[in-house]
Design a protein with these regions (language model features):
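Catalytic-site microenvironment of enzymes
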Residues: 2-8, 19-127
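Bacterial N-terminal signal peptides
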Residues: 9-15
Length: 127
C-alpha cells in the first residue's frame, strides 16, 4: 500500500512539475498592453542586469512629426513602442527593466500608423 501511494505521489509530481515550472517563469507587465502583457522568462543570461529605458519625448512634446499616407506620424509613439519591445526582450532574458516614460493605455501596437496620444507620464507623473 505504501509503495502504491509513493508511486502515485511521484506520478503526480512528474505531471504537475512542468506546469508549475511554466507558471513560475510566466510574468506580466501591463505596460505592454492586453495582448502582450504576459511573457515567459526563457533565459537567465541577463540576470542581475538592470536597464533604465527612456523613449524620450511624450506628453506635450511629440518629437518629430511627419506624414505618411496622409496621416501624421509622431516620433514619440514609435520610440515608445520600440522601447517596450526592447524591454520585453530584456525581461524575457531575466533582466530588471525600468520604463521611465510610460503610457498605461498604448502598449505594444502592431499597426503601421500609431495614433498620437498625450497620456505619457514620467515614472507615473504627468509630463
Amino acid at each position: 500500500m505504501n509503495r502504491l501511494r509513493l508511486t502515485l505521489v511521484a506520478l503526480c509530481l512528474l505531471l504537475l512539475a512542468p506546469a508549475y515550472a511554466q507558471k513560475k517563469n510566466t510574468r506580466r507587465e501591463p505596460l505592454f498592453g492586453k495582448a502582450n502583457a504576459t511573457y515567459q522568462v526563457t533565459s537567465n543570461s541577463l540576470k542581475g542586469a538592470t536597464f533604465y529605458l527612456v523613449s524620450g519625448h511624450g506628453g506635450p512634446d511629440p518629437g518629430c512629426i511627419g506624414k505618411y499616407q496622409g496621416k501624421e506620424l509622431h516620433e514619440d509613439e514609435y520610440a515608445y513602442d520600440i522601447i517596450l519591445r526592447l524591454g520585453r526582450e530584456l525581461l524575457k532574458r531575466g533582466a530588471k527593466v525600468h520604463f521611465i516614460i510610460q503610457d498605461a493605455k498604448d502598449g505594444i501596437r502592431n499597426t503601421t500608423i500609431l495614433k498620437n496620444s498625450k497620456r505619457e507620464t514620467c515614472m507615473g507623473r504627468p509630463i
